[in-house]
């Protein structure tokens, strides 16, 4: 099982090109199921979850070719309408085949999901929405089994904001008969990116980027070409690493306007920031000031950046309160950060972080995707050697992280 070996050694300096967003690429790949035509994608990140999704689509009969950051999909021969447990258990996003399969083929069997163990993340909103659109759904033997001759447009109000739920129902609605209105829809940039691809494929969607999506169903969708949006969480992770190490870093291939809350918090911590159309520069002249924040749905502070900011706060001046409102059980990195010398106490859904002047290297264990990123940041500023075990979590969401960090001065390597 691979590990990272890190020697904390000073500031990150240079340039990093940010990869395409995992959380946009996965639903966009599944959207290939909605048409028998060819869908061509660029800027697809080289990640374990992407490879798992392609494997799942191929098992269904999809032709899927991967060439660097380019993926070509053709769904003309899709004939297996099932997502098996072996693949779904490793990646919750497999649930995203449910809507497209029911919409185009009238049937789907999808195993109940797995993925990172950070809270319940129920799929009941997906099921409720599809039922409102006329699907008959049963759950038996660990599978969601959905059937519908043709989905019918409906008004769907989800009880909570759900990103994958919005994406699943949006894809299903594109081929439904009549008008579907999705109320309380997720507004994440990755949802917007999916919607923009669907429009290129011939879908009729209004309200893109808002919490109310109105979809006029069409008979069929056609092929299209699309470039996946930049990964705002990868960008934020590298910015936190630069801030923690008192670095000077330029990120290329990013969209600063989808990172507003993260950039605001970095400024509050003392970072000097410059932005252009597709780049961000961060320079950190002195030790960070502790920043308190509360996670919430976009456009508020993203839960996927909570752990990385906690690592920055761990070596900041002062005390920060970090409140997690999206997922329960998302403080598993606290124990590991404390092993490195951090002073963090958890009180319910809030962590109180007392900044310390320095951390010291130790053996730690990654527990989920973003927790592993926080440990990398902590390792970069810790004295001596840090070894992070179970980095397969990290590989699910970061494209060659060690190569990108090494190129800007980090002493980090992958060991078996």
Curated annotation (Swiss-Prot):
It catalyses: phosphoenolpyruvate + UDP-N-acetyl-alpha-D-glucosamine = UDP-N-acetyl-3-O-(1-carboxyvinyl)-alpha-D-glucosamine + phosphate. One of its GO terms (molecular function) is UDP-N-acetylglucosamine 1-carboxyvinyltransferase activity. The modification 2-(S-cysteinyl)pyruvic acid O-phosphothioketal is found at residue 116. GO terms for cellular component: cytoplasm. Keywords: Cell cycle, Cell division, Cell shape, Cell wall biogenesis/degradation, Cytoplasm, Peptidoglycan synthesis, Pyruvate, Transferase. Pathway: Cell wall biogenesis; peptidoglycan biosynthesis. The keyword Zinc-finger does not apply. It is found in: Cytoplasm. Cell wall formation. Adds enolpyruvyl to UDP-N-acetylglucosamine. This is UDP-N-acetylglucosamine 1-carboxyvinyltransferase. It comes from Cupriavidus necator (strain ATCC 17699 / DSM 428 / KCTC 22496 / NCIMB 10442 / H16 / Stanier 337) (Ralstonia eutropha).
